[in-house]
Curated annotation (Swiss-Prot):
Functions in the early steps of protein synthesis of a small number of specific mRNAs. Acts by directing the binding of methionyl-tRNAi to 40S ribosomal subunits. In contrast to the eIF-2 complex, it binds methionyl-tRNAi to 40S subunits in a codon-dependent manner, whereas the eIF-2 complex binds methionyl-tRNAi to 40S subunits in a GTP-dependent manner. GO terms for biological process: positive regulation of signal transduction; regulation of translation; response to amino acid starvation; ribosome assembly; SREBP signaling pathway; translational initiation. GO terms for molecular function: cadherin binding; mRNA binding; ribosome binding; translation initiation factor activity; tRNA binding. Pfam families: eIF2A. It comes from Homo sapiens. Residues 531-582 form a coiled coil. This is Eukaryotic translation initiation factor 2A.
Amino acid sequence: MAPSTPLLTVRGSEGLYMVNGPPHFTESTVFPRESGKNCKVCIFSKDGTLFAWGNGEKVNIISVTNKGLLHSFDLLKAVCLEFSPKNTVLATWQPYTTSKDGTAGIPNLQLYDVKTGTCLKSFIQKKMQNWCPSWSEDETLCARNVNNEVHFFENNNFNTIANKLHLQKINDFVLSPGPQPYKVAVYVPGSKGAPSFVRLYQYPNFAGPHAALANKSFFKADKVTMLWNKKATAVLVIASTDVDKTGASYYGEQTLHYIATNGESAVVQLPKNGPIYDVVWNSSSTEFCAVYGFMPAKATIFNLKCDPVFDFGTGPRNAAYYSPHGHILVLAGFGNLRGQMEVWDVKNYKLISKPVASDSTYFAWCPDGEHILTATCAPRLRVNNGYKIWHYTGSILHKYDVPSNAELWQVSWQPFLDGIFPAKTITYQAVPSEVPNEEPKVATAYRPPALRNKPITNSKLHEEEPPQNMKPQSGNDKPLSKTALKNQRKHEAKKAAKQEARSDKSPDLAPTPAPQSTPRNTVSQSISGDPEIDKKIKNLKKKLKAIEQLKEQAATGKQLEKNQLEKIQKETALLQELEDLELGI
């Protein structure tokens, strides 16, 4: 039996309603439209069979499969809802308030039994940040951060704390996905000169100095983002500072760290300086993609050794999204960028399409792995609100624009469990569509009247880097570094220009056949025929190679000595001398 079509939930000033997914795009009868502007929150369960929403008066739960109302709770101010992984518990959160007489406020975090509708437990949760408890996928374990320590509950028994993880001041934690044994990553910020650190533990082994599976310390961290891979074998940590002391950025400084449950850890070396915009794991758990660097940003896929596998070059992007099956990757530039998307086949590293979703504030893959949702929502943008459904080949299949006096607040797909939709063969041909693709108008630069009839000279603010495969090629020669390759290209271009200039100056002379070029790393071969000149060329190349190594050390942050800096300053003169010798000047 073919899987049903995913639904689309739309919430805005026009009300709350559902739309059938591709290929129909008609309003669904599963959920009768609820008019008005009072709906503050709505959410599907993890498997998409339940739907809950709060309308300012009640929080309701319906069954999507039989269209029946299950429960209704009197929660006037609920603004956050979350289902547990197996639909056993519905968590609700309301803003915390205290009485005017100064007495403690009432509990504002409620956990309801979805089957019976009874309240299992109520807690006081003052902050909206990290308000929801974290469950394991089988719901045998649930965890909350309470007063800088993690409390663990077993089998949804919230009256008894089964275990505690207490360190100095736990700021954040992330429970691992997948089956047992469960693991937890905790972050403790640094204080009084001590570094910040992230530790990995296996539940319930928290006691003892060697209980941690892995530990990673770093000084430059005011906050962190921890990302488990799907198999719970490793965590990626984005460490951020609020202020960049080097003055290179207004938005602080970021570093990317890799921590494995076997104790291994590493700093992921990013070739381009600048902020880290996004990091995302592939569903295979064997590689991850990072988007980083000053604009135009770079995007690179790394393996579990933190070695680059494929570099997508530079472009206007700040986000990455893997498809549910992990075979397609979308690199996009949203927010203050124009909305250009690059859709890549990451098995063959081939570009599929480059659609543009202008002014988009939201992106989501459909659970079928074929369709994409982009939307422009308020309050991020209050004009041109609406949503589009694309095929990954770049075709717009459906488009909806809200009226000019209305707003769109939220659009979301109905989730499905993994394996419901099988992965399909990737196609590069755009699927047919009745909705025309709107080509964005390219703004032309102003040209004064005196220059309008003259040819346009194109000038670039930066050099764009093309995509390249970073896997080492077969052979014994060690690949050159990026800096060495760049200098090699510059040198070869200068050499060709000089040869061309010399041939222009002496047109009478008969052209002599150019000697066959030799690889840069085969310095032992005779170049000029003169042993003395060959010896000088060999020594110059040795010095230039040493300078390249010094520059690479400086790029990693190593402090160089004065004599080493003086060597680097001599690079231009050495290159010139080498050119003169090779050209026979």
